[in-house]
């Protein structure tokens, strides 16, 4: 990796970064330090490629923390941050490890979150 970095073909980020118009890279800790979650904004909505922050549509409860998250308390806080924004901004969350549910909006119900309306990724324009 050092050779790739030295060649200028790898750019490391230390803060949330705008990659280009419509694509922001945001950092989330917990599963691993500095996990990148791309936020893709279209005229219709923002899509969140959540990686391991919310791996499955059924893991919307903030208390559902993966056993392999290296920092579970941090993971809980980061998951809450992502879910709060997704619910309030009506963002579409893409579940990277879910074989059955590809993408949904998120709805807050009392102190918990759940997958709400399915969103087709074919509609991204």
Task: Put a short name on every predicted segment.
Residues 1-15, 36, 53, 57-65:
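Active-site-proximal loop/helix segment associated with metal-binding centers of metalloenzymes
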Residues 31, 35, 97:
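Histidine-centered divalent metal-coordination motifs
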Residues 39, 43-125:
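Cap/insert and terminal regions of metallo-dependent hydrolase folds
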Residues 1-27, 76-90:
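Metallo-beta-lactamase
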Residues 23-29, 48-52:
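Active-site-proximal beta-strand elements of phosphoester/diester hydrolases
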